Amino acid sequence: MSELIELVGFLHDQNPQVRMLAVQHLLPYTARNHPQFSIWFHNDFEPVKDLKALLKDKPQIASQAVTALVNVSQNEKVRKVLMDDEFLQLIFSIVTNPLHGLADLSCMLLCNLAKEEDFARILDMQVPLREFSLSKNIIDQLMDLFVKGTDHGINEYANFDFLANVFADMTRFERGRKYFTTLQEYDHVIPASKLVVFTEHKSLLRRTGVAAIIKNISFDIPFQKVLMDEEGINVLPYLLLPLAGPEELSEEDMDGMFDELQLLPDDKKREPDHFIMKTLVETLVLLTATREGREHMRRRKVYPIIRELHLNVDDEEIREVCDQLVQMLVRDEAPEELEHIQDNPPDEDDVIVEVD
C-alpha cells in the first residue's frame, strides 16, 4: 500500500509526463471490486480531488482522468466528493462544448453522479448559451444535446446516448419528474414529449433510458391525461409499436387501433431487449390507474397487441405483466370507483457505468 500511496502522490506532480504515467498506472485500481480500491479514500480522498483537477490538464491526461473518474464514481463515498458546484460546472462545460472530445465520457460520469438525489440541483444551474440551444439552463441544454445530438449531429465525437440514463435517474425523484412533465418557457414544449420518440431508436442505451423515464413519470396520475392526449404527447403508439409483431390481426381487432399499428410488415420485429419490453408493459399497467385511461386504451385496441405479445414472447415475467394489463382492460367497470395506483416508487435505475 505504501507504494500505491507514493504513486497517487504523482497525480499532482509538476511534470505532465509524470502525471500521465501516474494516472495510467492507477487505472486498474479504479475497478470497484479491486481489493485496493480504498487507495482512492487516502488522505480525505486526495487522489479523487487530483483526478478532478486533471480534467483541466492536457487532453491526453484529461482523457485518462475522466475514465478513472467514471469508474471510481461507482462508489457512493466518492460521488459525494464529486458533487460540488465547481466540478459539476466543469463537467457541463465539457459536455456542452460541441468541439470537445470527452463529451461522451463526461456523460458517462454524469450517469453515476445522477444516482445522488442532490444531483437535482442542476435544475438551478446555468451555463453560457450555445448555438444548439436557446436556454442557459443546463438541464435544457442537456435535453437539446440528447434530442439534436444523436448520431453525432452536434459533436462529431459524441452521440449523448448516456444522457438517457441521467434523465432516467432524475425522474426517480419528484423534482426531476416535475421538470420532464412541465412546459418549459424557452421552447414552449414539455420535455417528455421530446423523449417518447426514442422508444424504437437503434441505441439500446437510449431505448432503455427513455423507457425508464416514461415509466417513472407515469406514476404521476394527473399527468397521465397529458401523456395520453392525442393532441399532445400521445404516448400510447410509442409504447405499443415496440411491443407489436408481424402477426395478422382481424378487422375487428384493428377497428380503432392507431394507424401506425395496423397492417405492420411481415418483417416487423418486437423490442429485442426483455428488460425494456417489460418496462413498456409495466408502464401501460400504470396508465390503467384511471377509468379514463382504461377506456382510452380499450378504444385504441391495446388488448390485441398485448394478446399477441403474450402468445409470442418466451419470458415468464413479461407474460405475467401482460396478464395484469389484460385483467385491467377486460374487467367490468363499477359505476363509481375509487381510483388508485400501485404504491411503488419510480424505478431505481441501478445501471452503474464503468469503463473497461
UniProtKB/Swiss-Prot annotation:
Gene Ontology molecular functions: protein folding chaperone
GO CC annotations on file: cytoplasm; nucleus
Any one biological process term the GO annotation gives: chaperone-mediated protein folding
Listed Gene3D superfamilies: Leucine-rich Repeat Variant
InterPro entries, A to Z: ARM-like, ARM-type_fold, Hgh1, Protein_HGH1_C, Protein_HGH1_N
Coiled-coil regions listed in the entry: none
Pfam family, one: DUF383
UniProt family annotation: Belongs to the HGH1 family.
Name recorded for this polypeptide: Protein HGH1 homolog
Organism annotation: Schizosaccharomyces pombe (strain 972 / ATCC 24843)
